[in-house]
């Protein structure tokens, strides 16, 4: 048996097995041979055979702690957890100083979600064997699962200090550092893991993820390529390649990556949604109807098949929107919160408002809300901006950095650290301006950054989260029939929920000729992102063009592939593709100026124009919308009601088509609508920033008064003020 043990030690498992069998052929009850052969069978995946062998050892040597420990390992592999725990308990009872048995017992208890007992077992193992690297590693894994990130990192670091050759410790340390948003350190940990284990595909994959977070997209792509060279079937690396290719504005290649991932692992979280979003981004509608039905089915089954924002653009169903939001919020649920509940929060004469966003720069949210931040009554409110987006030094960033009492860059802080900072600053009301949009940080609010937490502006739907108390809305975007589909208490603004900045600059006038538009044609436009253009919307647009000879459709040139696909689709409808004209992205003031060259903005469904509708109305261009069921499908209607253009709200495709054709065919009707718009633009609530600011301050005051009185959050309506004060 010494030769068998030696062969095992050097990795010659075949030789070791032969020698064990030879020993057993001479003596069938040879315990050492039975034990080692059981371990060899387990290593080879023959777990049932291993269990039989190790059971014989335990029966023959009932007071052998090692035998009970080994048998416990096999029972754990067989998922016979109660029996496994009994074996480990027997092992440590027989030999209380048996560190390995304490460690294995801890691993099993961790699997059983008995975290406190598992930690106690790990502590026992480490007390007995202070340089037990594997126990520190296992303790780190459990602490990571418990979201005790700093402690997890310390345990992985201790394991590495004892044994620098543990690749998994380097790798998992990288994962914790990534979660702590310490991306450069995380990358170094992945590099360390790869130095120990060059063929570690998952380490290359996660290394790519942190490089992506650092904005090093080409480097991230190369890291994913390394992962796939090692393991071409690693679905996560295909998915992440798709994500980074999206960032690199290479949607065609991204689609290919998602397709490969779907073949390998079709049920991956978020994958079907990411694939569909990419298809709609390039206006590739082939198979989308069936794929959307499958997405709906998966969400209805309780599967996180898409990011909530993706679903808003595909399916007009408020109940489904709530379901996908709740599934998304589950990962940040308060049960995972580490910070204790807020107790004894100080009351302030000035209400302390925290606005949380990644978009304090040239971004749609900033264009809308800049005036709000500047108009707040500083005698009654103290404003703090928490910025977790890139530090883009543009004109809007410069403007916003002076619009708050405090402007804090929290990019490098973890969700828990941001929440703790908010508590230290005694923020009364935390306003999430992101929701489930790009670069969102819902984990901050799951940690309860403030006693009152509000969803506003960024995400047009419910967050589905117990930690969000209120949503700012209006009677149009959340009508009574939709109220059951929102988990938040609803604050109904007296006018539109959407803030607008009355200071927005419109550039110098530009001619149609300079924009590549026909001088005398009727110009329909839609500057929504391409993913909002569905095949049914485009079909309707083509019927409108067919019925209005000589008209053109002016669209945003999101990407070349989308333009190509839309031109092909136009030709398939018998419409000359030259009647589709694509505009490049340009600075906002110039964009507002060029918008005036259009005659009519025609909206999309189920995801309406939001900021783009406000842009058009501010520029004096009427917006024709079709109002749907969900928040995202009703925003343009809210805007039109509050600028006095209800006649441009339709509820069916036929109404929408007929109104577009009428406005194109009847110049006097269009002129009347435009005249009304220009008159109302300066007098209606929609572009009265100060009036809106006073109303939302009234909302904040009522929220805070309820909190100070010990009352729970409830729906309420903000009373309309006659004029800004």
Regions found by a protein language model. Name each.
Residues 380-382, 542-572:
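A conserved nucleotide-sugar
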Residues 525-536:
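Substrate-binding clefts and catalytic carboxylate motifs of secreted carbohydrate-active enzymes
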Residues 527-528, 556, 626:
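Short beta-strand->loop
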Residues 1-518, 529, 539, 567-576, ...:
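Alpha-helical solenoid repeat scaffolds of the TPR/TPR-like class and their adjacent stem/linker regions
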Residues 602, 616:
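Donor-sugar nucleotide-binding helix/loop cap in glycosyltransferases
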């Amino acid at each position: 048996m010494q030769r068998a043990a030696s062969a095992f030690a050097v990795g010659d498992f075949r030789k070791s097995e032969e020698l064990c069998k030879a020993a057993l052929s001479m003596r069938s009850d040879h315990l050492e041979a039975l034990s080692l052969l059981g371990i060899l069978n387990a290593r080879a995946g023959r777990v049932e055979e291993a269990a039989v062998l190790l059971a014989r050892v335990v029966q023959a040597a009932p007071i052998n702690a090692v035998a009970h420990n080994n048998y416990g390992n096999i029972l754990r592999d067989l998922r016979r957890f109660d029996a496994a725990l009994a074996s480990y308990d027997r092992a440590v009872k027989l030999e209380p100083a048996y560190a390995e048995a304490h460690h294995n017992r801890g691993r099993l208890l961790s699997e059983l979600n008995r975290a406190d007992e598992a930690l106690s077992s790990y502590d026992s193992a480490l007390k007995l064997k202070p340089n037990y690297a594997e126990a520190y590693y296992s303790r780190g894994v459990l602490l990571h699962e418990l979201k005790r990130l700093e402690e997890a990192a310390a345990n992985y670091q201790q394991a590495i200090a004892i044994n620098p050759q543990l690749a998994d410790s380097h790798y998992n340390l990288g994962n914790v550092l990534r979660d702590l948003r310490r991306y450069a350190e995380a990358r170094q940990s992945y590099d360390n893991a790869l130095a120990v284990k060059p063929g570690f595909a998952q380490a290359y994959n996660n290394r790519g993820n942190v490089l992506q977070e650092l904005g090093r997209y080409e480097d991230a792509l190369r890291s994913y390529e390394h992962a796939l060279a090692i393991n071409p079937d690693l679905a996560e690396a295909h998915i992440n390649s798709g994500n980074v290719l999206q960032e690199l504005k290479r949607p065609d290649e991204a689609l290919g990556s998602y397709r490969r991932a779907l073949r390998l692992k079709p049920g991956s979280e978020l994958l079907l949604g990411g694939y569909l979003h990419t298809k709609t981004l390039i206006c590739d509608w082939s198979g989308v109807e069936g794929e959307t039905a499958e997405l709906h089915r998966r969400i209805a089954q309780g599967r996180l098949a898409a990011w909530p924002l993706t679903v808003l653009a595909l399916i007009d169903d408020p109940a489904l929107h709530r379901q996908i939001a709740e599934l998304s919020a589950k990962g940040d649920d308060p049960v995972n919160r580490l910070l204790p509940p807020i107790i004894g929060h100080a009351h302030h004469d000035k209400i302390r408002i925290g606005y949380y966003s990644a978009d304090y720069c040239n971004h749609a949210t900033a264009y809308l809300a800049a005036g709000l931040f500047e108009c707040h009554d500083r005698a009654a409110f103290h404003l703090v901006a928490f910025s977790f987006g890139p530090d883009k030094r543009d004109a809007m960033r410069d403007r916003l950095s002076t619009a708050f009492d405090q402007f804090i860059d929290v990019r490098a802080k973890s969700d828990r650290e941001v929440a703790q900072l908010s508590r230290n600053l005694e923020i009364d009301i935390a306003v999430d301006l992101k929701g489930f949009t790009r670069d969102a940080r819902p984990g901050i609010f799951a940690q309860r950054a403030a006693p009152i937490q509000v969803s506003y502006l960024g995400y047009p739907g419910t967050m589905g989260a117990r930690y969000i108390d209120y949503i700012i809305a209006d009677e149009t975007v959340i009508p009574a029939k939709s109220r059951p589909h929102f988990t938040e208490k609803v604050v109904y603004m007296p006018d539109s929920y959407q803030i607008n900045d009355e200071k927005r600059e419109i550039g110098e006038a530009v001619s149609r000729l300079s924009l590549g538009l026909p001088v005398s044609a009727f110009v329909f436009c839609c500057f929504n992102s391409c993913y909002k253009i569905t095949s049914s919307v485009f079909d309707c647009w083509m019927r409108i063009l067919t019925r209005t000879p000589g008209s053109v459709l002016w669209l945003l040139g999101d990407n070349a592939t989308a333009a190509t696909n839309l031109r092909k689709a136009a030709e398939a409808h018998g419409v000359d593709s030259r009647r589709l004209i694509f505009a490049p992205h340009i600075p906002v003031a110039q964009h507002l100026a060029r918008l005036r060259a259009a005659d009519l903005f025609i909206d999309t469904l189920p995801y309406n124009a939001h900021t783009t509708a406000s842009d058009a109305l501010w520029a004096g261009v009427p917006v024709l919308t079709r109002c749907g069921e969900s928040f995202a499908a009703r925003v343009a209607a809210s805007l039109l009601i509050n600028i006095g253009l209800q006649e441009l709200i339709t509820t069916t495709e036929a109404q929408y088509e007929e109104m577009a054709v009428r406005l194109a065919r009847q110049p006097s009707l269009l002129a009347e609508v435009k005249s009304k718009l220009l008159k109302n633009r300066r007098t209606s609530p929609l572009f009265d920033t100060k009036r809106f600011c006073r109303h939302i301050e009234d909302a904040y005051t009522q929220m805070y008064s309820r909190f100070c009185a010990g009352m729970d959050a409830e729906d309420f309506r903000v009373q309309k003020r006659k004029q800004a004060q």
